[in-house]
Swiss-Prot record:
The gene is UTR1. It is a multi-pass membrane protein. The chain crosses the membrane at residues 11-31, 49-69, 80-100, 112-132, 135-155, 206-226, 252-272, 301-317. It comes from Arabidopsis thaliana. A motif (Di-lysine motif) lies at residues 327-332. This is UDP-galactose/UDP-glucose transporter 1.
Length: 332
């Protein structure tokens, strides 16, 4: 009975993680799309300062991670010192800002699809720079994802969708998403390097260090430079409290979502987390299509299916590889 009870508790915990990640990030996507397309107030002004979301997100996540460390973490656990995150903090500030800014030029579903193709630059750099040889199925995954994103980008966007964008410009929007992926790649590699050098580093330590530097860099950019948009963004929020409320909810969703991601990775591993977040992106596109009143065409849905088919196949390949490793461990 105890074994069954333990298994049932794990199922409940997994269900909690799935519902937490899905609800937090799907709603955050809705808020992100709202802030990038909606016209606020009687003067129908757009919130043009989308990069300000990064600063707000960093501040909320910094406070959240500090509270979690005080409540749950062991003090002086020998984790990475805060200053080691300075370089990853730079790319983690620039990359997501570019991804958010892309929403001025392309639709939310297009942005989600483009940002789902993270494996493409990873495999490209691995092949060209490090001479890594990948298997045929891995190349097939990349082909499906790259093909789906490329065809989606080439298909004509509806006039209704274009009218909601602040500055429609597909090439610029996709270029910003590509740069976002490149910076994310450096950020992830740096975080892995820090974790390997300081094995006792916990997830909350990483969250605190990254968001501390993110807050510092964003504050300098937003308020320290002559062209900084921080004061304009705050003034906009004062004039349009509805936008300020949406920004606060956006940040809370991000903090809650990160909490469930860390919980998933620590209890079920990174593969389970990848599966949950990948399916969440697909649902986000469906929700965006329904709620925005801009349903995708059959061809566009075909492209979406290509991308997530490739991602699903990649997850399956990782699972098979994990199974082989486990069998080898059992034999030895």
């Amino acid at each position: 009975m105890e074994v069954h009870g333990s298994g049932f508790r794990r199922i409940l915990l997994l269900a909690l993680c799935i519902s937490g990640i899905w609800s937090a990030y799907i709603y955050q996507g809705v808020l992100q799309e709202t802030l990038s397309t909606k016209r606020f107030g009687p003067d129908e002004k757009r919130f043009e300062h989308l990069a300000f979301l990064n600063l707000a997100q960093s501040v909320v996540c910094l406070i959240w991670s500090y509270i979690m460390i005080k409540l749950w973490s062991n003090a002086g656990n020998g984790g990475a010192p805060w200053w080691t995150y300075w370089s990853a903090g730079i790319t983690n500030t620039i990359g997501p800002a570019m991804g958010i800014e892309a929403l001025k030029y392309i639709s939310y579903p297009a942005q989600v699809l483009a940002k789902s193709s993270k494996m493409i630059p990873v495999m490209l750099m691995g092949t060209l720079v490090y001479g890594i040889r990948y298997t045929f199925p891995e190349y097939m995954c990349t082909f499906l994802v790259a093909g789906g994103v490329s065809i989606f980008a080439l298909l004509k966007t509806s006039s209704k969708t274009i009218s909601k964008l602040a500055h429609p410009n597909a090439p610029l929007g996709y270029a910003l998403c590509s740069l976002n992926l490149a910076f994310d790649g450096f950020t992830n590699a740096t975080q892995d390097s820090i974790a390997s050098r300081y094995p006792k580093t916990e997830a909350w330590d990483i969250m605190l260090g990254m968001n501390l530097w993110g807050t510092i860099y964003n504050m300098i950019y937003m308020f320290g430079l002559p062209q900084g948009i921080g004061f304009k963004a705050i003034q906009f929020c004062k004039l349009h409290p509805e936008a300020a409320w949406d920004i606060l909810k956006y940040c809370i969703c991000g903090a809650v979502g990160q909490n469930f991601i860390f919980m998933t990775i620590s209890n079920f591993g990174s593969l389970a987390n990848t599966t949950i977040t990948t399916t969440r992106k697909f649902v986000s596109i469906v929700v965006s299509s329904v709620m925005s009143g801009n349903p995708l065409s059959l061809k566009q849905w075909g492209c979406v299916s290509m991308v997530f088919g490739g991602l699903a196949y990649q997850i399956y390949l990782k699972w098979k590889k994990l199974q082989r490793v486990e069998k080898k461990k059992q034999k030895s």
